[in-house]
């Protein structure tokens, strides 16, 4: 037994096996990206910052059905509906999302019958105060206007699987 230990230490078996393993990984392609300068791929089902969408004519899509508010497990969505219009439709007077409470589960997006509320492609929305994470209707509509092209493309790509 002692002779075996002497042979191992003289031949540096552990060192050589560790060195071989390190060299194997040293020459493989890198698995990480240089984040601020390179962006990783985000699939069409990526769930990022929330947005309210509009129809091509500029009218907001939300019909104040409150399904998203009812299905939200975190109770992060608050909606107030206005009175019915002459054409029988309703629109929201207040649409708030508390992004601190939101768990980004996507259930609001799945429940919406008109694809009004979506989780967009943006994941870089750090803020300095908690109040900035209380999104009102105007902020959500601005997000929708900003990301509409990419949101529409993601919905079109994902449509066969819905």
Curated annotation (Swiss-Prot):
Keyword Cell inner membrane: yes
Location within or outside the cell: Cell inner membrane
Gene Ontology MF annotations: 4 iron, 4 sulfur cluster binding; iron ion binding; NADH:ubiquinone reductase (non-electrogenic) activity; quinone binding
Enzyme Commission number: 7.1.1.-
Binding site residues for [4Fe-4S] cluster 1: 62, 65, 68, 112
InterPro entries, A to Z: 4Fe4S_Fe-S-bd, 4Fe4S_Fe_S_CS, NADH_quinone_OxRdtase_chainI
Catalytic activity field: a quinone + NADH + 5 H(+)(in) = a quinol + NAD(+) + 4 H(+)(out)
Chain residues that bind [4Fe-4S] cluster 2: 72, 102, 105, 108
Primary location class: membrane
Listed PROSITE patterns: 4FE4S_FER_1 (PS00198), 4FE4S_FER_2 (PS51379)
Occurrences of domain 4Fe-4S ferredoxin-type (ranges): 52-82, 93-122
A single GO cellular-component term on record: plasma membrane
GO BP, one annotated term: aerobic respiration
Coiled coil: none
Requisite cofactors: [4Fe-4S] cluster
Keyword terms of this UniProt record: 4Fe-4S, Cell inner membrane, Cell membrane, Iron, Iron-sulfur, Membrane, Metal-binding, NAD, Quinone, Repeat, Translocase, Ubiquinone
Protein topology in the membrane: Peripheral membrane protein
Gene3D superfamilies: 3.30.70.3270
Cofactor note as given: Binds 2 [4Fe-4S] clusters per subunit.
Superkingdom of the organism of origin: Bacteria
Oligomer status and interactors: NDH-1 is composed of 14 different subunits. Subunits NuoA, H, J, K, L, M, N constitute the membrane sector of the complex.
Biological role stated in the UniProt entry: NDH-1 shuttles electrons from NADH, via FMN and iron-sulfur (Fe-S) centers, to quinones in the respiratory chain. The immediate electron acceptor for the enzyme in this species is believed to be ubiquinone. Couples the redox reaction to proton translocation (for every two electrons transferred, four hydrogen ions are translocated across the cytoplasmic membrane), and thus conserves the redox energy in a proton gradient.
Assigned protein family: Belongs to the complex I 23 kDa subunit family.
NCBIfam families tied to this protein: NuoI (TIGR01971), PRK05888.1-4 (NF004538), PRK05888.1-5 (NF004539)
Full protein name: NADH-quinone oxidoreductase subunit I
Encoding gene per record: nuoI
């Amino acid at each position: 037994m002692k002779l075996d230990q002497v042979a191992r230490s003289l031949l540096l078996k552990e060192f050589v096996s560790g060195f071989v393993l390190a060299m194997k990984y040293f020459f493989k392609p890198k698995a990480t990206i240089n984040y601020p300068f390179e962006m990783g791929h985000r699939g069409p089902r990526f769930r990022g910052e929330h947005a309210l969408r509009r129809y091509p004519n500029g009218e907001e899509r939300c019909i104040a059905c409150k399904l998203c508010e009812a299905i939200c497990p975190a109770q992060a969505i608050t909606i107030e509906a206005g009175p019915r219009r002459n054409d029988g439709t309703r629109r929201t007077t207040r649409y708030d999302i508390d992004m601190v409470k939101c768990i980004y589960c996507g259930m609001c997006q799945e429940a919406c019958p008109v694809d009004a509320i979506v989780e967009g492609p943006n994941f870089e929305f750090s803020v300095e105060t908690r109040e900035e994470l209380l999104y009102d209707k105007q902020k959500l509509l601005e997000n929708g206007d900003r990301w509409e092209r990419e949101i529409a493309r993601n919905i079109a790509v994902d449509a066969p699987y819905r």
